[in-house]
Amino acid sequence: MVTLVTGGTGFVGANIVKHLADNGHNVVSFDINGPDKLLEDFVGQASSPVAFIQGDIVDPESVARLGLDYQIDKIVHAAVYTVNREALEIERSRDVIAINLEGTANLLELARTQQTKRFIYVSSGAAYGSALPSDQTLNEETPPVPENLYGITKFASEMITRRYGQLHGLSTATVRLSTPYGPMERVTGHRAVMSVFHDWTGRVARGEGITTEDMDDGRDYIYIADIADGLRTVLDSPNLPHNLYNLTTGIWLTLQEILDGIIELSPSTQVTTPPAKLAVAAGGNYSRGPLSSHRLFSDLGWTPSYDLKAGLTDYLKWRTESGYLD
């Protein structure tokens, strides 16, 4: 019996693959990209071997072939086209829809034919949209109002996943992630814009200074190891009282708080503050409030293990030990 992880060579997927392999799962990764040296070294430290299969989730025959080659017990569908800039959304509109919707349908059909024990759809806080008040904490009962193609396709895939499960007797669940940071974030074919954590920790690792931006801007960041652990908790739980969970720390972090945390760990790092008129908010406009983690704690007892200092410490250690300086 194996656990299939789509998008297993990407940022979130790579961490899911390693964490599951470290916790008793026989993992098969399915991704349009093969593993690079950085990923091989990262996953190579896992307790169980991982099979990397290269293929396209949009191709139904390639997806169906997985069911012939492996006895698939559980699926974590993390493959996605991440679009967080309107220019890229305009340029790749068809790709976003094909990958995020057709790919999900193909994986659900595989789950149906294999009668998997659990299908997890990895969604995003983007499903809520950004039009909601920034001081409003968003729980799973908050009505989603996504505006861009990324958020729209994530929410649509959630609904498709739920209905497919109802129609075909599958145990399905959606997990909405808040904003991740940590090891294995890098530019890939489906992820082009990096987080401020990636930028600033990279500068520290290279011995460069940091140029600040709009320091009041922020997000509800969560360390990637906590995301992997939270997803495994939902995946392996014998019973799920709900089919939708937020996965988050529930804590809003401003850029100033992140910078303070980095400087505490690397006091020699030089900081430059440009004139206010030149400052640009990291990651673009982002006005939604933090997600609530109450349901995941109440139902399954899950809580995050990493606060900001612990996450930054672990991330900087990985950058140093892996030699990843980009």
Please annotate each region the language model reported.
Residues 3-23:
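N-terminal Rossmann NAD(P)H-binding glycine-rich loop of SDR-like oxidoreductase domains
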Residues 54-99:
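NAD(P)H-binding glycine-rich loop region in Rossmannoid oxidoreductase-like domains
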Residues 77, 105-149:
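Conserved Rossmann-fold NAD(P)-dependent oxidoreductase catalytic core, especially the SDR/UDP-sugar
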Residues 124, 158-184:
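Conserved beta-loop-beta element that borders a ligand/cofactor-binding pocket
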Residues 155, 168, 180-198, 208, ...:
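Glycine/proline-rich active-site loop of Rossmann-fold NAD(P)-dependent oxidoreductases
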Residues 188-194, 215-228, 244-264, 306, ...:
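Substrate-binding strand-loop-helix patch
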Residues 204, 230-233, 237-281:
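Mid/C-terminal beta-alpha module of Rossmann-like enzyme folds, strongest
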Residues 308-326:
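Amphipathic terminal alpha-helices
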